[in-house]
Amino acid sequence: MGVNVLASTVSGAIERLGLTYEEVGDIVDASPRSVARWTAGQVVPQRLNKQRLIELAYVADALAEVLPRDQANVWMFSPNRLLEHRKPADLVRDGEYQRVLALIDAMAEGVFV
């Protein structure tokens, strides 16, 4: 994935979830300055950061289909009983984005969560 494609992917996730650079940095374990440089296409993140950013963008795409931006942001940072009271953002940070996607899929199917 090229610098500009990744920058667009990161920027899209930030926009869809209404995230700040600090929030993205918390999710991918990076400084807000690094996130700003990634979104500007100035640098390419290291492998693990890149992987987490791609996973975050994937989650953002799915969540944008079921919740408006302001609700999606709150949902990402709120403890959830169906995730053992963990925050979806924390699961993405820990590489467990598939659990978050499963919950989003359940929401899309009309399962009350």
UniProtKB/Swiss-Prot annotation:
Recorded superkingdom: Bacteria
Biotechnology: Molecules that disrupt the MbcT-MbcA complex could be candidates for anti-tuberculosis therapy.
Keywords from the named record: Toxin-antitoxin system
Knocked-out gene: effects: Essential, it cannot be deleted. Deletion of the mbcT-mbcA operon has no visible phenotype.
A Pfam family this chain is assigned to: Xre_MbcA_ParS_C
Induction statement: Induced by hypoxia. Expression probably induced in both active and resting C57BL/6 mouse macrophages. Induced in persister cells. Induced by Ethambutol, Isoniazid and streptomycin treatment and by starvation, repressed by rifampicin treatment. Probably part of the mbcT-mbcA operon.
Family that this chain belongs to: Belongs to the MbcA/ParS/Xre antitoxin family.
Protein function: Antitoxin component of a type II toxin-antitoxin (TA) system. Neutralizes the activity of cognate toxin MbcT by blocking access to the toxin active site.
Subunit structure: Heterotetramer with 2 subunits each of MbcT and MbcA; the tetramers further assemble into trimers with 3-fold symmetry.
Protein name per UniProt: Mycobacterial cidal antitoxin MbcA
Organismal lineage: Bacteria, Bacillati, Actinomycetota, Actinomycetes, Mycobacteriales
Gene it is expressed from: mbcA
